[in-house]
Amino acid sequence: MVRKPGSMYRNVRQRSFTRRKYMGGVPGSQVIHYDMGDKANTTFPVKISLVAEEKCQIRHTALEAARITANRHLVADAGKMGFYMKLRVYPHEVLRENKQATGAGADRVSSGMRRAFGKNVGTAARVNSMQKLFTVAVEKQNFPAAKKALWHAGQKLPTPVRIVIDEGAELVQ
């Protein structure tokens, strides 16, 4: 079956569905690393964060795409040990889909909306308004590279985002 568009799962419409103890066959998260860069040195002078402006659900595939993009830009511009990046949300929410048969004779095979609870197809992170998604710590000279990397990561996410300076604002002004 074809993967459904992320816009189907973006809005928070129902209560949380996270109790894996009662579910069979929850697909694993594609997000592998939550800490990247120089993990031994997390005390860089400038810290900036990517903040979600709206409440939404972000699929694990979108989180992984944003993480890869930001990490690639940071490694290219600041070097492997010139930054520390942390992904601050985890995809706990289990997403379901009621599969529909299509094509000739589908009405004989499909049960329509009868028993329409759906099967587990993926996971998502529930994000509140103004919640931090990514945090990057860098040296003063790598601030523009970190800002560019977070902007590119924000393009992969289903919500409007903003970049906020957490620490070291006086160093970069």
Curated annotation (Swiss-Prot):
It comes from the Archaea. GO terms for molecular function: structural constituent of ribosome. This is Large ribosomal subunit protein uL16. Belongs to the universal ribosomal protein uL16 family. NCBIfam families: PRK04199.1-3, PRK04199.1-4. CDD domains: Ribosomal_L16_L10e. Keywords: Ribonucleoprotein, Ribosomal protein. HAMAP family: Ribosomal_uL16_arch. GO terms for biological process: translation. The keyword Translocase does not apply. It comes from Methanosarcina mazei (strain ATCC BAA-159 / DSM 3647 / Goe1 / Go1 / JCM 11833 / OCM 88). GO terms for cellular component: ribonucleoprotein complex; ribosome. The keyword Ribonucleoprotein applies. SUPFAM superfamilies: Ribosomal protein L16p/L10e. Coiled coil: none annotated.
